[in-house]
Structures are given as C-alpha cells and as structure tokens.
From Swiss-Prot:
SUPFAM superfamilies documented for this protein: Acetyl-CoA synthetase-like
Gene that this polypeptide is encoded by: caiC
Function: Catalyzes the transfer of CoA to carnitine, generating the initial carnitinyl-CoA needed for the CaiB reaction cycle. Also has activity toward crotonobetaine and gamma-butyrobetaine.
Catalytic activity of the protein: 4-(trimethylamino)butanoate + ATP + CoA = 4-(trimethylamino)butanoyl-CoA + AMP + diphosphate; crotonobetaine + ATP + CoA = crotonobetainyl-CoA + AMP + diphosphate; (R)-carnitine + ATP + CoA = (R)-carnitinyl-CoA + AMP + diphosphate
Protein name: Crotonobetaine/carnitine--CoA ligase
Amino acid sequence: MDIIGGQHLRQMWDDLADVYGHKTALICESSSGVVNRYSYLELNQEINRTANLFYTLGIRKGDKVALHLDNCPEFIFCWFGLAKIGAIMVPINARLLREESTWILQNSQACLLVTSAQFYPMYQQIQQEDASQLRHICLTDMVLPADDGVSSFTQLKNQQPATLCYAPPLSTDDTAEILFTSGTTSRPKGVVITHYNLRFAGYYSAWQCALRDDDVYLTVMPAFHIDCQCTAAMAAFSAGATFVLVEKYSARAFWGQVQKYRATITECIPMMIRTLMVQPLSANDQQHRLREVMFYLNLSEQEKDAFCERFSVRLLTSYGMTETIVGIIGDRPGDKRRWPSIGRAGFCYEAEIRDDHNRPLPAGELGEICIKGVPGKTIFKEYFLNPKATAKVLEADGWLHTGDTGYRDEEGFFYFVDRRCNMIKRGGENVSCVELENIIATHPKIQDIVVVGIKDSIRDEAIKAFVVLNEGETLSEEEFFCFCEQNMAKFKVPSYLEIRKDLPRNCSGKIIRKNLK
C-alpha cells in the first residue's frame, strides 16, 4: 500500500504552495528575538532559490551536502532545496567538536558544507589539516572571511530565480538524508532516510496528534534531530499547519513563546519538563491553547501529574528512534492512554517483545522491543555504507531490533523498561559510553576507564567516569575535565570522576557496569 501516493518532496512543496499560498507556513525565532515569517508560497520560493544556489555550485542528484547549523530558516531552505534536486542532506549535530564533525564529513562523502561564522574556524582547520571531500563552504552570515572556497549563502541565494532551474527525475525511493546517530559502538552510523520516509513521517505524525491546517506546531528541538524533522516539521507542513521553529530552548522563555504564537501542539523531553517545573509560579501558566504535548521517555508518574496539573496540559507519549523515523509506538488519537505505558503500535507497524533467541514472548514477559515496518518507507532504509550494522538490527522481513527492553500487557499496550545497549540519555541527547571511553583512554595517565549513566533529577542521566591510573600517576579533577572538554562535545563531558584501584570485571574480563551504578 502506497500511503503517500507516489509523491516525493519536490511535488509536496509545489502542491503546498498551490493549495495554501499565502497562509503562514514557517515562523523562526532566533535567540536574539529576531522573527522571520514565510507563507507557503514564499517558503517554496526560498526553497527553489536554495536549490538553484546548490545547482550553481555544482551540486547534482546524489551529491551529499552537510549542514552544521543551529535552528534557523536556512536549515529548512537547505533541507528541502537539496531534496528538490535529488541531492542528500547530511545534518551535523551543532554541538559536535572537530574530531566528531570530521568523521561525519569523511564518512558521509559530503562535498559542500553550509554553516555559520560560529562554526567556520573549526571547518577552516578541518579543510587545512584533515582529509575530506569537502570542496566548498557556504556561510549564512553576511560578513565573509577572505578565504578561497567560501561563499555567502544569503547573497548567492538572493541572486537565484524563484522557479526551479534543475529538476532531475525523482523517485520516492531516492535518498533525501543521511542522519548520523549515536549507537552502541564508538562511532555514529549514518541512517539513510528516503523521500518516502519523510513523506510518510509527515502523514503519520499528523495523524498521531490529529493535526489540522489551523494548528500551530511549536518546537525547540534541534533541527538536526529526527524529532524536529519528522515529528514536528514534516507533520506541520503535511497538514498545511504553521510550524514555529525556536532557535534554542529557554525554560524562562518557553511559555511566553507558546502564548505569543498561539501554539496548539508542542513537544517536550524530560529535561524540559523538569526545568519548566522549577520556574516561578505564574498566573499565566495555564494561559495557552495547547491541546497536546508530544512527549518522549522518561518521566515518573509524580512528575507527569505535577506538570500536567500545573500547566493544564496532557502528554501524548511517543516512542521511537532515528531508525524508526517516527514514534512507532505511542498514544493514538481517540484511544485511551495508560501511563506509564508508551502506547500501542501505530498504523502500518507491528510490535512484539522477543527473547534472546528472537522468539515472540507473551504478555507480561520482559524482552526486546521489536518493530516491523517496510525499509525505506515506514522505517529507515539502511545504515550508509555499513551493511554489517544494518544486518545486525534489521531482518530481511522488516523486523527491526531496537535494543530496548520492555513488555506488553494483554491489551497491546507496551512498556519501556531500560535501554539494553550502553547508552546514556542526557537531556535529550544519546551518548555512547564506548565512544567516551575510547576518548578518555587516550589520556596518558589513564590505564583503565568505564563510563556509566547515573540518575539526574534534571537531565535524565548524568555521566560518571571511573578511572584507574597508571602506577605512580596522579590526576586532578581539573586536569581530567579540561581534557574531556578539549576532546568531546560539551554535552558528552562527564559530570563526575571517581579514581579507583581497579574496576569490577566478570570471569570473561568484561566490566560489570551494574556494580558501578
């Protein structure tokens, strides 16, 4: 069954411009308070100009273009401008540092980068010292360095016509995006997302929260994340609604933004809920039009009840990951909700709990949450240039192994228990323990290292490092944290350090992590 009617992203935007015309499509608010608004017609024209910009710079169908940007209109222009000419977006987490960004550039085969002056010095260094296929950089800022191979995105875009100059044949099976996500290994994997995936995500997420064209969907989630793209942006645009993209989350500003834009839908992670709850009580706490707050793991029942009562909202639970594209298990429109259940399988999906031998388990028994979808349509297509990793999680018949532990009840409600893999959930970011351990292990004074997540009242989990030093060495906390800050993104830096004589291991030599939590 073809849910999207064979419609790729170029057709989608041309149709949206025709149908909704001067209706507001996109509102972007920067951290400095600058607000940009675009109608569906204007946004489609900006997307076309951006597509023409890329074509002028030599980008053709199948080429990869990296984006290292905070939330801004240019991200939206690039995302769909690239899709219109069959090129592929590679979004980079805006908080990553040089080594991590270099690795993604190299492994995605990106030949062009769009970024801002804030991140340019890092990429200038990458171009000079690291091997990559990067041949040009576009800066979204008006003031440019006097460097070769650097252009002004805005100036080039404004020189382009508002009609598309290059329209190669497109298929819904074509790749639209490669989104690198942290995994259980030390390196992120490139999740291949097709035009069909994105179109389906729009219809599915709009169905999940019963989105209408008079809705206003506000998000503070970063545009380089699947949540912002597929749960928020694609849903809003597919429904002809208004999408409000705020540059960065601020607990102090959030409810004011919800009220200012008359938002009817938003999305939250636990860190947001906890920081909102510690804000001073206000008479305006319930002065909003929100009917749904899309919510992602994990929150206690007490926290949930307190938040819902104070702000007069209800949470719509949704469970998924980058590989599932959308929240494949969740609360459904018109269906009962059963907290702390993560909901039931959505349309076009099957869900099971399986044991270690890949056999389905009955209700009430713990096992791995597994999802059945159609690769390249309702779930991701594959990991980019990584067939081994793909085969490890995705069976030939479309069953996806999430690596998460849970159970279901007799009525088909699923319950999330824990992450099977060594991942730390920190304020909405997934952090790989193995990745951090490999970085910290390069410190000359450290002999052995293990990283674990410990409970944190605000950010879900804090990161704690246990280290064993080389004989005769001493290591101060200042030296350790300084080393971490220089070698990993800020959100990955451990909060705690404990120096030990040894680490607990089993008979196979593997570290027993549970003994350290």
